[in-house]
Amino acid sequence: MVCRFYDPEQGSVSIGGINLKHVVAGELRSQIALVSQHPLLFSGSIMDNIRVGNPDASDDRVKDAAKLARIHEDIHALEAGYQTLLGQRGEGLSGGQRQRMAIARAFLKDAPILILDEATSALDSESEAGIQEALAELCKGRTTILIAHRFSSIKHASRILVMDKTLAGGAIVADGTHDEVYATSALYRQLYDQQKLSSS
């Protein structure tokens, strides 16, 4: 809803007190960087795929963004480097590499609003730990919305909303920092403890 891919049937979504229905979708999206679980990559070079974040960016800026997203070394290891051609939907790259390319795009776009929708879901625990520092840097100074099932991705968020999808239409059942929702929400505590136990 924040990106206006669809509008709410009831109520409204506002940013800075402005109802998003009154904002041209294209203008709104120019202010948002989105890193999704399944990034949209296209046939073309790796350089051009990252440059989607900022079409005017120099090659050096693209490479800097790739370094911040921890994908530069993977690209550099390819025979054609940044000129390596990708197939449809990024064929030839792993899921984690595709996600890190999307993170590089977000660094390059430098938008005031950042949406991370399961942005590290395709990374193993070791790779995710390495990228968390980069994501923390990316989140600085901007409004960030994290959608995640992995608690390591959200534990340090300043505000966590816990949704219970078993309630009609899904409902927010807890709101606060990690410590606050852990103390007050049985659902959050149960899920957090289960995930912590399974990862140890």
Language-model-detected regions and their locations in the chain:
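Conserved coupling/switch loops of ABC nucleotide-binding domains, chiefly the family-specific signature
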Residues: 9-12, 169
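C-terminal boundary and immediately downstream tail of ABC-type ATPase nucleotide-binding domains
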Residues: 183-200
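Nucleotide-activated donor-binding/catalytic signature segment of Leloir-type glycosyltransferases, i.e.
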Residues: 75
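ABC-family ATPase nucleotide-binding domain "signature/switch" substructure
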Residues: 1-5, 26-41, 46-51, 56, ...
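Conserved ABC transporter NBD signature motif
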Residues: 11-18, 28
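Glycine-centered secondary-structure boundary/capping sites
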Residues: 4-7, 14, 70, 191, ...
